[in-house]
Amino acid sequence: MSQPSGGRAPGTRIYSWSCPTVMSPGEKLDPIPDSFILQPPVFHPVVPYVTTIFGGLHAGKMVMLQGVVPLDAHRFQVDFQCGCSLCPRPDIAFHFNPRFHTTKPHVICNTLHGGRWQREARWPHLALRRGSSFLILFLFGNEEVKVSVNGQHFLHFRYRLPLSHVDTLGIFGDILVEAVGFLNINPFVEGSREYPAGHPFLLMSPRLEVPCSHALPQGLSPGQVIIVRGLVLQEPKHFTVSLRDQAAHAPVTLRASFADRTLAWISRWGQKKLISAPFLFYPQRFFEVLLLFQEGGLKLALNGQGLGATSMNQQALEQLRELRISGSVQLYCVHS
């Protein structure tokens, strides 16, 4: 059973996920490696909420949770499970359980294996508050998961079960969820990491209406990363990400052509340089564009996969003042 990426009917449990795609008769999708496909964010799911994690968990994956703690909240839990069966209960590799109803609110973390809870770990000084909004980011590494709350590192928990066994996310208890996001870590070692701050997903935000203009008042400096996340519309025609200088010239533009399924850099003078990569921008698919600025040019990553670099004069980089996004997309996040 597959569901759209919006809210769910009460009690709905999701056991698989797929990307709906509109195609012409006889048309076939180009083969795309699983590593290039990102699971779309889910907005306003009804709790309890259970969903498959597309591709399972692996080192370098992030799960972002945005929401509000109700004023009368007692507790809630976020479980990273090994399956989604109801009976027997699946193993839980990482159980994250904030508790508010005690005199000293705290978080309990634990692992459920073979129907038995193991030794629990407790963290005091809970950074979550009743009646307040939050952004929790789970960053999965090789040996442990790190958790940040509202941009501050909060805890780390060493795995007791193999991370590769985890394929399901469960959210239960007293929590109002605004969005759940599934991301890959920034692949650029020299670029800024999103953990622990995170950049929230926004649904139908006026600031992200397309065409979208994002100011770069200080220009761009080496190590700076631009993030663009969104969803391709049902009948896409074009998609461009351009960088403009003070004279409104665009020294460099990233353009996705839906007619011939190509991705290319377009210079100020209209010269095209094709990018060798699977074409990811299919209808109703989630995408992430990362641009890392470095000395002499910029690097590109799509959906967490590095795709090389293009050269650009350093002086031209410093004179850039605007990021402009246009085309057949719905934007969820733009950050620089």
Swiss-Prot record:
Galectin domain residues: 49-183, 212-336
Q: Where in the cell is it found?
A: Nucleus
Give GO cellular component annotations, separated by semicolons: cytoplasm; mitochondrion; nucleus
Record-linked Pfam families: Gal-bind_lectin
Main localization category: nucleus
Tissue specificity as recorded in UniProt: Not widely expressed. Predominantly expressed in adipose tissue.
The alphabetical list of record keywords is: Apoptosis, Lectin, Nucleus, Repeat
Specify the superkingdom. Eukaryota
In its UniProt record, which GO terms are filed under biological process?
intrinsic apoptotic signaling pathway
Repeat as a keyword of this entry, yes or no, is yes
Q: Which GO terms describe its molecular function?
A: lactose binding
Q: What's written under domain?
A: Contains two homologous but distinct carbohydrate-binding domains.
* Function as written in the Swiss-Prot or TrEMBL entry: Binds lactose. May participate in the apoptosis of adipocytes.
**Which PANTHER family does this chain map to?**
GALECTIN, GALECTIN-12
The name this protein carries in UniProt is: Galectin-12
> What is the gene called?
LGALS12
